[in-house]
Regions:
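A short beta-loop-alpha structural element at the N-terminal edge
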Residues: 2-17
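Conserved GNAT-fold acetyl-CoA-binding loop/helix
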Residues: 23-45
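A short helix-loop-beta-strand connector motif used in the catalytic cores of GNAT acetyltransferases and
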Residues: 47-58, 79
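Conserved beta-strand in the GNAT
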Residues: 58, 64-72, 77-84
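A short, internal acetyl-CoA/4′-phosphopantetheine-binding micro-motif in the GNAT/acyltransferase core
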Residues: 60, 83-90, 115-118
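Conserved acetyl-CoA pyrophosphate-binding loop and the N-cap/start of the following alpha-helix
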Residues: 89, 93-101
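C-terminal "cap" of GNAT-fold acetyltransferases
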Residues: 112-150
Length: 150
C-alpha cells in the first residue's frame, strides 16, 4: 500500500475513488453521488476540488486507487473529511495509513472530523489514532464529532 498526496493532475484517480465511495457506501457520507455526477462530473470540477485549500490523499494498491481521505483547514485547526477504503482493501491497515497521512500533514494542528453515528468500523479506526467521540447528539446529517486529543 502506498498513500500519496494528490493534486489537480490526479483528478481521474480522485474521481474514480470518490464516485465509487459514494456509490458503494452512501450511508457512510453526508454527501451523495448526485453531487459528483451528471453535469457536475467534469474535469474542471474535479481539478477545482483538488485545488482547494488543504490536502487530498489516495491509497494505492499497485496502481489501483483503493482509499481516500481529505484534510481541510478550519478556523479551529484541520478537519479530516471524505475517508473511505474499498471493501476489498479493508482490514489491511489502509484506513490507518490514510489517517496517519492527515495527522502528518496537519503537523500538530487540532484535528477534528465528523462521522456518521453508528459507523462502528470508522469509529474504531479513528479511536485507534487518538480521536475521541465528543458528547452530544448527532447533527442534522446524522454525524457526530470526534477530536484528536494530543
Amino acid at each position: 500500500m502506498d498513500v500519496r498526496v494528490v493534486g489537480p493532475d490526479d483528478w481521474a484517480d480522485w474521481r474514480l475513488v470518490r464516485q465509487r465511495s459514494l456509490t458503494e457506501d452512501p450511508e457512510a457520507f453526508a454527501s451523495s453521488v448526485t453531487m459528483w455526477t451528471g453535469d457536475r462530473d467534469t474535469e474542471a470540477n474535479w481539478r477545482s476540488r483538488l485545488s482547494s485549500p488543504g490536502a487530498c490523499f489516495i491509497a494505492y494498491d499497485g496502481s489501483t486507487p483503493v482509499g481516500m481521505v481529505g484534510a481541510r483547514p478550519t478556523d479551529a485547526g484541520v478537519e479530516l473529511i471524505s475517508m473511505w477504503v474499498a471493501p476489498e482493501a479493508r482490514l489491511r491497515g489502509i484506513g490507518g495509513g490514510l489517517i496517519d497521512a492527515v495527522i502528518g500533514w496537519a503537523s500538530g494542528s487540532r484535528l477534528s472530523l465528523r462521522v456518521i453515528d453508528g459507523n462502528a468500523a470508522a469509529l474504531t479506526a479513528y479511536a485507534s489514532r487518538g480521536f475521541v467521540l465528543q458528547p452530544g447528539c448527532a447533527d442534522d446529517e446524522g454525524c457526530r464529532t470526534m477530536l484528536r486529543l494530543t
